[in-house]
Amino acid sequence: SGPDVRSVLQGQTTKNFQTLPLNRAIDGAFCNLKGRVIADFTAVMTSDERALLRTDAGVAQALQTHLGKYLMFSKTTLTLLTWNCWGCSHSSPPIASDDLIVVPRSASLYEVWCDNTGAPDHVITQDAWRYERFLRGEARICEATMHQFLPQDLNYDLQGIIDFDKGCYTGQEIVARLHYRGSPNRRLSLHAITRPTAPPYTDKHTRRS
């Protein structure tokens, strides 16, 4: 939060925060200087001086440390929140408010972010939510996969997670060069496996067969 929150996020993410309307959710990513994804996120600007970002809990502390060196030169503070994030399925989502954020994912699927411990109506299981996410081809960064992939490796360029017209941000030169002058050597693809518990996807899982 703070008067510089839009400019900070504009210079550190793959999305355009200068033109983002209030209360509209977007998906984006933070990259390092080599263009590798540190974390993916969903963000909502609740006011011109306040943004809420949802990311994997396992990367939140490392992301805060990464952003700290940029925040010291701005009028912006970053606070780790203990909000709950629920995956829900229903044709009529709840009405959003200051302490309840609703993020549509499909005609009947949506996320609910809230700062209290009570679960909203129509919550589905974590396994069911992950299954729907996998079917949509959504790759999410966890602690084990930080700094490993270019956005194109994860199909972020095909999913609208990169804005190639927004201007400079950390890692932008490498991401843009691949987009305009080359083509990805690998792409994330969906496969079925028989293991009861799958390990995090790694480099070898994105190589072309």
Protein language model annotation of sequence segments:
Residues 1-209:
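Basic, glycine/lysine-rich polyanion-binding surfaces/domains
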